[in-house]
Amino acid sequence: VRLVGNHPDVVPWLQALDVFVLPSYANEGVPQALMQAMSCGLPCVTTNVGAIPEPAWDGLTARIVPAQDADALRLAIVELLADQSLRGSLGAAAREHVVATHGRALMLDRMEALFHKAVEAP
């Protein structure tokens, strides 16, 4: 584990990882760090807190463990580190899902629709 501080471009750091872990335990929306990791095709281990289960589906796009369960977190990390095929399939599914549901083009289309709606409102 290496804490590298704040960086304007996280993609090179994410690409250097084997597994991304976000052990949130309270008050989460949809974490941008998780979305960035998933969009880079990283297999992720996270918790079932807040809106995290929206992009992270256990066994499909990520491994989800109960919040504050250190043993479950450890087991999920060990499982992914030991299984390259599982890392690849979860990472690919994560990227496909995040790009399809939260990709830049989709977000821009949604924002444009909101602006049009706001301008047309009485």
Regions inferred by a protein language model and the residue ranges of each:
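Nucleotide-activated donor-binding/catalytic signature segment of Leloir-type glycosyltransferases, i.e.
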Residues: 1-5
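Short alpha-helical segment that forms part of, or immediately flanks, the ligand-binding pocket
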Residues: 11, 29-39, 53-54, 60
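Acidic donor-binding loop of glycosyltransferase active sites
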Residues: 15-29, 42
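Short hydrophobic faces within alpha-helices
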Residues: 36-37, 45, 73
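Conserved acidic donor-binding segment of nucleotide-sugar-dependent glycosyltransferases
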Residues: 58-59, 63-70, 79-85
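A short, well-ordered alpha-helix in the C-terminal region of glycosyltransferases
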Residues: 72-75, 79, 86-101, 107-113
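Short alpha-helical donor nucleotide-sugar binding micro-motif in glycosyltransferases
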Residues: 6-7, 13-17
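Short hydrophobic beta-strand element within catalytic cores of glycosyltransferases
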Residues: 43-46, 56
